[in-house]
Amino acid sequence: MNPVPPNPTTNAPAPGGATHPTPAGSGSPAAASPTFSPLYQQIKALITQSLQSGEWKPGELIPSEVELAGRFKVSQGTVRKAIDELAAENLVMRRQGKGTFVSTHHEARAHFRFLRLVPDEGVAHYPESKFIDVKRVRAPADVARLLDLKSGDAVIFIKRVQSFDAVPTIIEELWLPGLIFKGLTAERLVEYKGPMYGLFETEFGTRMIRASEQIRAVCADAGAAGLLGVAAGTPLLGAERVSFTYGDKPVELRRGLYLTAQHHYQNELN
């Protein structure tokens, strides 16, 4: 049994809502044969489209499995499998006895999903931020490439120092596409008390879905040493992260330097 919206002769919609029809008139057997995706993957793509379009806002309850099964004319088991995958990807959250909700960066557990630096002792908590610089600039070539922009396009540049218990620990430089984050100012960043990704989600309609990160050992130069209150040459952890929203669209480049004297980088792999 197929759901009504997808066309069975095309690929299922990608998470960003794109479809990829099989090219017509191709002479190769591979191109001439239609490509099918499992039914639950088609349903997953359709639900993701609704999330991306804002039909269900972050933090809102989505329709029940029974309601979604009726909407897409598929079995409840097919819907459940689709939602299981969405939950595994942190796009939705199941709450026992309450239903399934759209994930939000305002959830307490989401605060540490993208912050992997945790204390060697004690309970992990969110750092305090001091903004060093916030300005609108032209994207350098390397930044433009990583954000899928043109060199010279407008970006928002943010530099901040984050401290745990008044100890400077993280230096971050961020680049955000200027069109998406138009209106983001230093004043707004300072007055906003929640996680930065929560601000992006609420005021700019941009939710971080996943990130790709590169990590290497570096030494503090004079500038970093001064901001962190350590000697030049102190070992630091350097990380470059590109974060993506729906449709695998890059919307943030973040370069960080981490002092690990009292913290360590922790990740869970599954």
Describe the predicted segments one by one:
Residues 2-25, 104-270:
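All-alpha effector-binding/dimerization core of bacterial HTH-type transcriptional repressors
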Residues 52, 75, 95-97, 203, ...:
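Short glycine/serine/threonine-biased micro-segments
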Residues 1-74:
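Extreme N-terminal segment that seeds HTH/winged-HTH DNA-binding domains in transcriptional regulators
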Residues 83:
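DNA major-groove recognition helix of helix-turn-helix
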Residues 55-56, 89-97, 103-104:
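Beta-hairpin "wing" of winged helix-turn-helix
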Residues 78:
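Residues in the helix-turn-helix
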